[in-house]
Amino acid sequence: NREPIDALTEAKAAPLSTALLVWWERHGRGGLPWKLLSGGVPPAPDDQLDPYGIWIAEVMLQQTQLAVALPYWRRWMAVFPTVEALAAASLDAVRLQWQGLGYYSRARRLHEAAQLLVGHPWPHSLEGWMALPGIGRTTAGSILSSAFNVPLPILDGNVKRVLARLMAHPRPPARDDALFWSWSEALLDPLRPR
């Protein structure tokens, strides 16, 4: 029965951040195919990963568990291996690959976004990603952190649950999002955003 903490000072955040990274090294989801270099090699901090595979994975993981999304991602990448292939596909072909994954507007938005992205460099900012259909702050932050090693916080349901427990906060209501974003940012290790 601890008191909830409203603000995370640097002194309070550093040991929590370290503990989270230690936990991640032991129990985290390493080895996800979109977070590896070709050949299955983990990236060095200066390595850029393929933004396309990460983007597809992050959209599939919106409201969908990893165990469900992973086989869909593998099939998707076999059929649409590049943003150009996705943009050139018919919407019916895209929907067919998405069939069974649910939340079908995600497939339509991926297709729309692919058509906007073709011929342009990948976005390197939150604003650039969030300008695309179906991309919010958490998805944009996750893509930028994973693909480009940019230190940006995320705040999905899992992160909220962990933060609520760490900070002795009652079940997180939506109106506390600003507080939870501040905690997520305070706990982010700028040297290890992936």
Annotate each language-model stretch with its function.
Residues 2, 22-194:
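Catalytic cores of DNA base-excision repair glycosylases
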Residues 5-9:
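Extended, low-hydrophobicity segments enriched in charged/polar residues
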Residues 13-19:
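N-terminal, positively charged, Ser/Thr/Ala/Gly-biased leader segments
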